[in-house]
Amino acid sequence: MAEFVRAQIFGTTFEITSRYTDLQPVGMGAFGLVCSARDQLTGQPVAVKKIMKPFSTPVLSKRTYRELKLLKHLRHENIISLSDIFISPLEDIYFVTELLGTDLHRLLTSRPLEKQFIQYFLYQILRGLKYVHSAGVVHRDLKPSNILINENCDLKICDFGLARIQDPQMTGYVSTRYYRAPEIMLTWQKYDVEVDIWSAGCIFAEMLEGKPLFPGKDHVNQFSIITELLGTPPDDVIQTICSENTLRFVKSLPKRERQPLANKFKNADPEAVDLLERMLVFDPKKRIRAGEALAHEYLSPYHDPTDEPEAEEKFDWSFNDADLPVDTWKIMMYSEILDFHNIDQGNDAGQVLMEGGVAQAQQNYA
């Protein structure tokens, strides 16, 4: 049997295999706690993310299952990669990934970024998005704190817990407000990969200016700030609004003209402003795509069409509309973990991974 070691981090029990030592807290999110650790097998530093009570509700179980499936499927230099996963005796799930020293949020709050860093970071964000979108996945929650960076300026997008299928019908209220695309606020239901391009544009603007472009205090204020810079949405965009209340609100706003971004970003290169103009477009159908943005003149120092891969196959979203009980999600999760480790479910190693009662669940639903 695997040996598990317990440690208290921020009042939370971290229960991990003895393979990982030197636990240090890195960050706390709504759904998990992240610690740095040393992998005794490889000698490399890693990040260990504890998913809090993943089997407490069907919604949380499904969210965890979705993130696990995505991390297994998405394999790209600019996407965080999964190196290990296990279930502890207390039935918590732990994702182990590579450790990067900082994130873009911390960098932006510490100092202004020089042009070559802005270019290189934006290039890597868009390179990652091109791959993710080609897999049929929308990140939905792209923001500086979800963009990890190491000392070599290598960048990786993380936190796919909110990611969804490319689907004309989607639920609203997902991404952090400052980076949220207007179609999420306006229609709530219908959006696609373009929401990530909007978020990337907001991040690009923040790298140029050193502060958030649209720091809304609430949903209404957020939309108002956007219209102050980009003008009133075109009529054909307004017509796509599903909610009567939202439609009334938008029509009640004073008509505003789009302001030239060059006036706001006076110190930015014309090429940078041009790319930003193409990313921050109200109509998602007219917003530049990741592949097109990579070929923009502003990113020419890094653009290499032979080294900007797309996914070999689409992500399988067949589970996503399933309304299943916790125990069923648990069995599915266990199966995915065994598949990750290439373990036959009948052997002893399989029993090790079933420490937290998953074995009992499988017996119940066999």
From Swiss-Prot:
Q: Note what the entry says on domains.
A: The TXY motif contains the threonine and tyrosine residues whose phosphorylation activates the MAP kinases.
Location comes to: Cytoplasm; Nucleus
| Pfam families reported for this sequence | Pkinase (PF00069)
What's the EC number here?
2.7.11.24
Keywords of the record: ATP-binding, Cytoplasm, Kinase, Nucleotide-binding, Nucleus, Phosphoprotein, Serine/threonine-protein kinase, Transferase, Virulence
Phosphothreonine carried by residues: T171
Q: Which residues bind ATP?
A: V26, G27, M28, G29, A30, F31, G32, L33, V34, K49
Give the protein name, as stated in the record.
Mitogen-activated protein kinase sakA
Entry's Gene Ontology BP terms: cellular hyperosmotic response; cellular response to heat; cellular response to osmotic stress; cellular response to oxidative stress; osmosensory signaling pathway; stress-activated MAPK cascade
GO MF terms here are: ATP binding; MAP kinase activity; protein serine kinase activity; protein serine/threonine kinase activity
Where does the motif TXY lie?
171-173
* Source organism (scientific name): Aspergillus fumigatus (strain ATCC MYA-4609 / CBS 101355 / FGSC A1100 / Af293)
| Positions of the catalytic residues | D141
**Primary gene name:** sakA
General function of this protein: Proline-directed serine/threonine-protein kinase involved in a signal transduction pathway that is activated by changes in the osmolarity of the extracellular environment. Controls osmotic regulation of transcription of target genes. Involved in environmental stress response. With mpkC, plays a redundant or cooperative role in the conidial stress resistance. Also plays a supportive role in osmotic stress adaptation when sakA is deficient. Involved in paradoxical growth, the cell wall integrity (CWI) pathway and biofilm formation.
Free-text activity regulation comment from the record: Activated by tyrosine and threonine phosphorylation. Deactivated by protein phosphatase 2C homolog 2 ptcB.
| PTM per Swiss-Prot/TrEMBL | Dually phosphorylated on Thr-171 and Tyr-173, which activates the enzyme. Environmental stresses such as high temperature, osmotic stress, cold stress or ethanol stress modulate the activation of sakA via phosphorylation.
Keyword Oxidoreductase found: no
